[in-house]
Regions:
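Cytosolic catalytic domains that perform sulfur/thiol-centered chemistry
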Residues: 1-274
């Protein structure tokens, strides 16, 4: 199953009436504002997804800033979205791709195999002038599936401490180097980690680079496979995007330290490099 779907291919499948569920993961810093943006304009046939409420658990120093959602929350979201085993799922966001990638990874982890990311998001859809709709969005279909977690590898903090392979920090270079940190308690990175900024896998329009280009980016850092690799970010967003890029490039098998730097840096006993 390919990770990405282009705006033109999605438009063709919508017009052809293909069985699929299109979900808009629209986030906004003010509660409820994401739904307001969605209701003003979205891709036809879309259903709204609230990343803060449906793709995250309760933040804590023990679990991280945006931990994985509890299974009861995810099961409720599956029903709200009307997920079905015979329907492909397509996620998109406003354009940067972080929340669509987060959704893609969480649903794959929860046992949904046919999940794709709209390459370039809603902004790329608009650039192609493919049309949009307003209002509350599509009515969900009957849901016939429940979350089945564990289908992708999750690394715990203990796994990271014991890891002898490659550890990748997917945040930007300033945060990795400890020169800037606006989101978490401390600046820096986990000792031994290398830095591959998730944004480096994207073109200027936030579409993914070609598989060949992405493989070269990883090869330049000594990474030629996803095996024995753990990826992290602050709280699961950039790391999900990096993992999507790795799968797009055929570098499969990496584990996801989802709690990431927000969990690691909250414990004063954990070592830090900067």
């Amino acid at each position: 199953m390919t990770v990405l779907i282009s705006p033109s291919t999605l438009a063709e499948s919508i017009h052809a009436g293909k069985k699929q569920t299109v979900l808009a993961a629209f986030w906004a810093p003010i509660e409820g504002a994401g739904r307001t943006v969605f209701c003003s304009e979205h891709i036809p046939t879309s259903i709204f997804c609230d990343p803060a409420l449906e793709l995250s658990g309760v933040p804590s120093s023990e679990d991280g800033r945006n931990p994985l959602p509890p299974l009861n929350v995810l099961a409720r979201s599956f029903r709200t979205w009307g997920l079905n085993t015979d329907r492909e799922i397509v996620f998109y966001d406003q354009g940067r791709g972080l929340f669509a990638a987060r959704a893609w990874w969480i649903l794959r982890w929860a046992g949904m195999p046919n999940v794709r990311i709209l390459d370039g998001g809603f902004q790329k859809w608009e650039d192609h002038e493919l049309g949009h709709a307003g209002g509350p969005g599509n009515f969900p279909h009957f849901c016939n599936v429940r979350p089945n977690p564990g289908q992708l590898s999750v690394a715990t903090i203990e796994d990271v401490k014991a890891h002898q392979g490659i550890l990748i920090d997917s945040r930007d270079e300033q945060r990795f180097a400890g020169r800037s940190e606006k989101l978490d308690l401390k600046a820096g990175h986990i000792p031994g980690a290398i830095n591959i900024n998730a944004k480096s896998l994207l073109e200027d329009d936030f579409t993914f680079k070609s598989p060949e280009e992405i493989r070269q980016i990883f090869a330049d850092k000594g990474v030629t496979s996803g095996e024995n690799v753990i990826v992290y970010s602050g709280s699961g967003n950039h790391s999900s995007q990096l993992l999507a890029g790795m799968e797009h490039a055929g570098l499969t098998g990496a584990s996801h330290y989802f709690a990431g730097w927000s969990q690691w840096s909250a414990n004063p006993e954990n070592p830090i490099e900067a």
